[in-house]
Amino acid sequence: MKFLIVGLGNAGNEYTHTRHNIGFDVVNAFVQKHAGKFVARRLAYVAEVKWKGKMFICICPTTYMNLSGTAVKYWMDKEKIAIGNILVITDDVSLPLNKMRLRPSGSDGGHNGLKSVEASLASRDYPRLRFGIGNDYPKGLQSNYVLGKWRKEEEPLVKLKIEKAVEVIESFATRGLSLTMNDVNSAEYSV
């Protein structure tokens, strides 16, 4: 069985390890854990990982966030991966830092990356893991917040949640969406 694991983020060193690029960080951690290696390919950095008899095509689009769907659609079609075997990992300001939420479908919630994926796939029915980043920013400064780096005191919890998100990817592929949702959606993370 084949899966497409998508980390949403913006390409470029200035965006490395920002809140908005947590999708990239999670996918990078998954690929590193399983001794994969990213290669620059069409529309994305791509790594192939084999684990427990399953193939994971892991991508970090190089298209910028608001065009991520182009890369998702291209790699889904190229690798002939069913929409239910896609997992998109993204940041979410509406969730506190200690939460993650796994869903089989849903709205874009105002997230430009998810909006692009939805438009390119012509569907809202694809699994997504929302990584809570909190909303501790003054009114009108959301862009600065999401494009900003983690605060020092947030880093231990972010590191833990990245490890847990890697486990979510593994569980999604081995146990299925429903069982994994039960575990993830009720959990609160702390260090």
List each model region and its residues.
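Short glycine/serine/threonine-rich phosphate/pyrophosphate-binding segments
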Residues: G110, L114
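Nucleotide and nucleotide-moiety/phosphate-recognizing core
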Residues: M1-S105, K115-L129, D136-L141, G148, ...
